[in-house]
Amino acid sequence: MSRPAPTPIYTLRGAGGPLNTLHFSCHGGDTPLLYSASGKGAIHIWNLNTRRAERIVEGHSGNSIIWVSTLQAAHTLISQGRDMQVCLWDLSEGRSEVVDSVWTGSVGFCQCSVLETSPGNQLLAFAGQQTEEIKIIELPSKTPVCTLVPDAKVGMVMCIKLWQPDSGPGPLLLAGYEDGSLLLWDVTQRSELSRAKAHPEPVMCLTFDPERLRGISGSSEKTLSSWMLDRQNNLQLQDDVTLVNAGVSQLCIRGDGKLLASAGWDHRVRVFGWKKLKPLAVLQYHTDMVLSVAFSDHQDPRQRLLAAGSKDQRVSLWSIYNEGADTG
């Protein structure tokens, strides 16, 4: 007998707008939290024990918020809005105030990427005012580090990912562009290391596994493209995954490197084994495009969750493949 189709263990309602981005914070303190940000400029901080919004933070002048994250420094939230601002929030002791902001000048949908370089210090990468440029600054000082502009015409920057390699200097940055290209940048040298043409359409999203030096990207078409870095930091295209329906908003790899989730324009979340890209499950609940997916960072593997946020203004939470299942 085939397994019954999975259902959400619960859903969160009341966000009041399309759910563009999700971020878990479950490893510190007693209360596991999920941050969601909407197209109406609201950030909901959901208490996963009570399954209710503990707090609602309004920002970015009501403009759509496209990215949220937390910094290691306690109670510091960072958000990016379509008002061309990145805001740093102090959420300690019941506060919800913007303590600093960065003007990006970008009107696109490219989400920022943040990398902790030392305790209390981060690098922040974001799409700049010019179509193809990526700017990187240090936080909290806001000192400019570099501006990365490709030599060839690749169109608008669509998605970026900062990461720190285990060996050699760093950090490095992966970027997907409007013409379907992926570029790997050396931030320190401000130079392009390699490129690959991963898609015929714009790269809508990418995610990267620094331990395995392997990544995957999606676009508006029916194909996910997987790729890897060799020892010389050359991008090498690997297998493609053909989807039933076109369009992927976001991709996410679980922290243990076993699962990959995709947010589909067809209202579905698809789950694959990350090792061999074996299809494992199709999660059907939402009534509109799924815009975001995130795996929780619980320390206990049995508590791990997958969250999906949709244009239908709901967040679904799922518990899947937590007990050593063969994910392939």
Predicted region positions:
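Beta-strand-rich domains and repeat architectures in extracellular enzymes and scaffolds
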Residues: T11-G41
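Loop/turn segments within WD40 beta-propeller blades
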Residues: L22-T31, V68-A74, S113-N121, I160-G170, ...
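A short helix->beta-strand "capping" segment at the edge of beta-propeller domains
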Residues: M1-G17, T50
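WD40/WD-repeat beta-propeller blade N-cap
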Residues: L12-L19, E58-I65, V102-F109, V149-V157, ...
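A structural motif specific to WD40 beta-propellers
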Residues: T7-I9, R52-R55, E97-D100, V145-C146, ...
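Conserved strand-to-loop turn within each blade of WD40 beta-propeller repeats
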Residues: A37-K40, Q80-D83, A127-T131, G176-D179, ...
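WD40-repeat beta-propellers
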Residues: I43-N47, V86-L91, I134-E138, L182-D186, ...
